[in-house]
């Protein structure tokens, strides 16, 4: 169930936090709020009361563990229920998140929730260039700027008309109309060079970007070289339906999605265990793939 509230306001962020801990950690109390948001116990209690007033069937106080626990008919109202939402929150808290209301003498203490994540190398983007790109998008302007690529390593001037920043896993890029190539294309942010200069209103609207505005579906299946038992594992991993995973995506982003899933569209890896997923509608989506 998708949330009916999102943590976009001060109140909603507290309600979201209450529900997040209650659902995923099985308990929440005023001390959790007080420590996480650096507020008084009185304020924290008011937020707990507010949550219970809004969603009276969700939480019940348990004297034994000194906290509110989910009731059997708990209904998600502020969180999505997707484990990645909780894991993303954990990631933002640091390498260890403890049960903040636990004490070493309490019989219901829990072990700290430990986790870690990879630290990816940063790609340098000049603040001057970044501010110019933001300004060009906000004001719908053309931008004169230098750019290098592996095929043209010498700094070449470009006039672009940017419309969207895109994160594709390891890096950020910019979707923009390129006047040199006369097409909408992707530019890696760290490869812009020089002193950018705004040069008048953009002449191409994002609505003209066919690759950006075309929705396609990638159909994936477990590698057929896997055994039936192995295929079932992959199907469960990705919550496949009838042995297939269908992923709707903007056509311009299809290749990036496949790369993140480590799905090769050129050749199969040496074994099914290494490949795991295969794209079964390659001919259908081939016009949008740039490594086919």
Whereabouts are the PLM-identified features?
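Core beta-strand-centered patch of the WYL/Sm-like small regulatory domain
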Residues: 110-224, 229
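Short, basic/aromatic recognition patches that contact phosphate-bearing ligands
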Residues: 1-80, 220, 272-292
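A generic structural signal for beta-strand entry/edge sites
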Residues: 65-67, 142, 171, 244
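Short, hydrophobic/amphipathic alpha-helical patches that form generic packing surfaces
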Residues: 16-20, 85-89, 252-263
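Conserved short hydrophobic interaction patches
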Residues: 54, 195, 260-264
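Bulky hydrophobic/aromatic content
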Residues: 70-144, 260, 267-270
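Polybasic (Lys/Arg-rich)
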Residues: 213-292
